[in-house]
Amino acid sequence: MDNNQAVSALWSCASATCLSLDAKRHSLEPSSPDGQASLDVNNKSAPVDAHARKLRHIAHTPRGSCFMALLLLLLLALNFRHAHSCGPGRGLGRRRERNLYPLVLKQTVPNLSEYHNGASGPLEGVIHRDSPKFKNLVLNYNKDILFRDEEGTGADRVMSKRCREKLNMLAYSVMNEWPGVRLLVTESWDEDHQHGQESLHYEGRAVTIATSDRDQSKYGMLARLAVEAGFDWVSYVSRRHIYCSVKSDSSPSISHVHGCFTPESTALLESGAEKALSELAIGDRVLSMDTKGQPVYSEVILFMDRNLEQVQNFVQLHTDGGAVLTVTPAHLIAVWQAERQTLEFVFADRVEELSQVLVHDATGELRPQRVLRVDSVQSRGVVAPLTREGTIVVNSVAASCYAVISSQSLAHWGLAPMRLWSTLQSWMPAKGQLRSAQDKPTPKDATAQQQNGIHWYANALYKVKDYVLPQSWRHD
């Protein structure tokens, strides 16, 4: 049964239920003066709009109101349609099954040196039990992982936070791929110097893994699952095990997991004034972009992140019109595809020279300008405002409010609960109305009261994404 048939059947069922309830009510009331009941449910010639009249009547009773609310929710759920967006994702709805191809012996992903910045990054130094950095390592007690622990010291459970995160993700994938089989860790942090002089095992950033059944035919796929889990470098190093490693927890490329702008970047208010992002407050209406690429003003409903002290790597885009946008690498930027006449959202670190971004010009329109130069810079402070529209124009350049996930429409859908909550809050009495006029906070006070750090909901979405989205949809 398709959605339309289901909706039709549900509506018919609801109508019949309402009619029967109404008939029962009228059977307990006096007849009309002409001796006929108010409603003859057996009358085949009754007007078609009788259903609507009865539904309206039922909706005015307490029980009927609950029934109608549930009915509406069911109708909305059954009549749900995929969202369309100019973003590059596949849209909302059911994810297509993807074919995962196992790695072959001696293959590495990515095909770079392990110590390259595009892989796990450079060595930072051996960590001993008495090293100051040892306290930054964590223990992994995941019951879905077997730790061989040949040394009997528990060292195989010791690892960096990022390594634990990716290992737990891999354990989940292994159980789904092979029911009854668990992930086996044969080596993690090494304090006995049993590896080469340069090894990330000494920093708790590397693991060697296998499956609990020791079935070597599974190891190629195990390596692929490790890639999907987000390990920064995976090697099918031998027929006996797989080697995986991660970036340092202090690496600038992962120290900030969400997309943000610099605090000194500016947004255009509806009043025509420009305001630094560090001074924006919830409720400000700023220039944004609608789904058709047209400029609109949209309300700031929350800050997904705000940290004025965080030192972070940024991508800096320079356009031929003089606009400069500084943004974190995983942030989505609106890019105009002239050949296809479409607008797509692309990760900032994947925007290339001669790409076209939308810039708010003197005419008040958003028009394409070519990117002349792409730089990498480091700066202090990150701010990530979320508008109701899901987009924002910063330093005159149109950008998404979202990052990490490649689909603008999917990210926007994921923040729907926060938009709903913001709407509900707008219906409630404002805090200022409960105080005297003298105590009402000023906009400057409201800005000062902004949260410091990642918003709890944005952080929750970040943690969930690895479980529900393939790596190709993520910026890892």
Swiss-Prot record:
Which processes are annotated in GO (biological process)? anatomical structure morphogenesis; cell fate specification; cell-cell signaling; intein-mediated protein splicing; protein autoprocessing; regulation of gene expression; segment polarity determination; self proteolysis
Please give the sites of covalent lipid attachment annotated as N-palmitoyl cysteine. 86
Signal sequence annotation: 1-20
> What's the EC number here?
3.1.-.-
Residues anchoring lipid (Cholesterol glycine ester):
259
Where does the record place it? Nucleus; Cytoplasm
Gene3D superfamilies attached to this UniProt entry: 3.30.1380.10, Hedgehog/Intein (Hint) domain (2.170.16.10)
Site (Essential for auto-cleavage) location in chain = 331
Q: Which SMART domains match?
A: HintC, HintN
Task: Enumerate the residues marked as the site Involved in auto-cleavage.
Answer: 328
Predominant location: nucleus
Which residues of the sequence carry a binding annotation for Ca(2+) 1?
Answer: 150-151, 156, 186-187
> Which parts of the sequence bind Ca(2+) 2?
151, 187, 190, 192
The feature of type site (Involved in cholesterol transfer) is located at: 305
Q: What is a single cellular component term in the Gene Ontology annotation?
A: plasma membrane
Similarity field:
Belongs to the hedgehog family.
What binding partners and quaternary form does the record give? Interacts with shf.
Name it. Protein hedgehog
Organism, by scientific name, is Drosophila mojavensis (Fruit fly)
